Amino acid sequence: MAKQGKRIRAVNEGIDRVKLYPLDEALALLKERTTAKFDETIEVALNLGVDPRHADQMVRGVCNLPNGSGRTVRVAVFARGAKADEAKAAGADIVGAEDLLETIQGGTIEFDRCIATPDLMPLVGRLGKVLGPRGLMPNPKVGTVTMDVKGAVAAAKGGAVEFRVEKAGIIHGGIGKASFPADKLAENIRAFVDAVVKAKPAGAKGTYLQRVAVSSTMGPGIKVEPATVHTA
């Protein structure tokens, strides 16, 4: 525990908890402090001026990160016939219909993204209580209910990141790995923020993008000046 406390003090040293850092400086500080033995995930957190308890202030969407996420994404596809073949050819890890339903109902969920053709949504709907809480339920708003199975699988594998506002008006997104060059991380963050801003709901009032912070898996959170991330 003493060794862990020393490491935490070391990564926090030199960071002003009140200051809003320009994005490039924040990323430099963060990368200097990624000392774990694995490739840490870099995450951005956005505080939005919305109350998601109101339907007209819900924020949800998807962002195709220009430099990928660095993650190996396992994709499951509900499809039959030619669309099932298309999914397999596109690189989907699991493809099925009733058989996939039974596998999931049996408690085996070995995927990170779930895609379905529209005709199979009545079947997939039976998994709402299982997939919904895990953020895996296919949804046309984020392109995971579609006949373009090939495109959806490619997007998921290539770094598409779904986002959804939480109760406190916060959105989190993993936007890359500590091994990424800082400029690539910055491009991903700006693309992610742009996607969230474009998803601004009609019911949002006042300042929409209120606070921005970046962090790593084992590192500190660093506050970022919003104007260096997105220009309104």
Swiss-Prot record:
Q: What would be one Gene Ontology cellular-component term for the protein? A: cytosolic large ribosomal subunit
Q: Which Gene3D superfamilies match?
A: 3.30.190.20, 3.40.50.790
Which keywords does this Swiss-Prot/TrEMBL entry list?
Repressor, Ribonucleoprotein, Ribosomal protein, RNA-binding, rRNA-binding, Translation regulation, tRNA-binding
Q: Which GO terms describe its biological process?
A: regulation of translation; translation
Q: Note the Pfam families from the entry.
A: Ribosomal_L1
- Domain of life, per UniProt, equals Bacteria
Q: Which Gene Ontology molecular-function terms are recorded? A: rRNA binding; structural constituent of ribosome; tRNA binding
Q: Which CDD domains match?
A: Ribosomal_L1
Please give the subunit comment from the record: Part of the 50S ribosomal subunit.
Q: What does this protein do?
A: Binds directly to 23S rRNA. The L1 stalk is quite mobile in the ribosome, and is involved in E site tRNA release.
- Family per record: Belongs to the universal ribosomal protein uL1 family.
- NCBIfam families, from UniProt? rplA_bact (TIGR01169)
Name the UniProt record assigns to this protein: Large ribosomal subunit protein uL1
Kindly list the organism's lineage.
Bacteria, Pseudomonadati, Pseudomonadota, Alphaproteobacteria, Hyphomicrobiales
Q: Which gene encodes it?
A: rplA
